[in-house]
Amino acid sequence: MANREGGRRNSGKLRRAKRKVCAFCMDKSEFIDYKDINKLRKYVTERGKILPRRISGNCAKHQRELTRAIKRARNIALLPFTTE
């Protein structure tokens, strides 16, 4: 018969990943500056995509601010839209 667990071997021993803490909340930074390219590059992939919240670990408020800052930096050519 088919395995009802969906192929999982340790079905009863699921382990939750540790929740990442928002780096901007830890620093207690007032706002995210779009001119701080080194900080913004940590949250952009090699392909130029913005990392989602579940990967970056940011809170919702700072993820919105980060997205705005990255888009502003792209518009004034501080960050590239895509890689070459």
UniProtKB/Swiss-Prot annotation:
GO terms for cellular component: cytosolic small ribosomal subunit. SUPFAM superfamilies: Ribosomal protein S18. Keywords: Ribonucleoprotein, Ribosomal protein, RNA-binding, rRNA-binding. InterPro entries: Ribosomal_bS18 (IPR001648), Ribosomal_bS18_CS (IPR018275), Ribosomal_bS18_sf (IPR036870). GO terms for biological process: translation. The keyword rRNA-binding applies. PROSITE patterns: RIBOSOMAL_S18. GO terms for molecular function: small ribosomal subunit rRNA binding; structural constituent of ribosome. Pfam families: Ribosomal_S18. The keyword RNA-binding applies. NCBIfam families: S18. Part of the 30S ribosomal subunit. Forms a tight heterodimer with protein bS6. Belongs to the bacterial ribosomal protein bS18 family. PANTHER family: 30S RIBOSOMAL PROTEIN S18, SMALL RIBOSOMAL SUBUNIT PROTEIN BS18M. Binds as a heterodimer with protein bS6 to the central domain of the 16S rRNA, where it helps stabilize the platform of the 30S subunit. HAMAP family: Ribosomal_bS18. This is Small ribosomal subunit protein bS18.
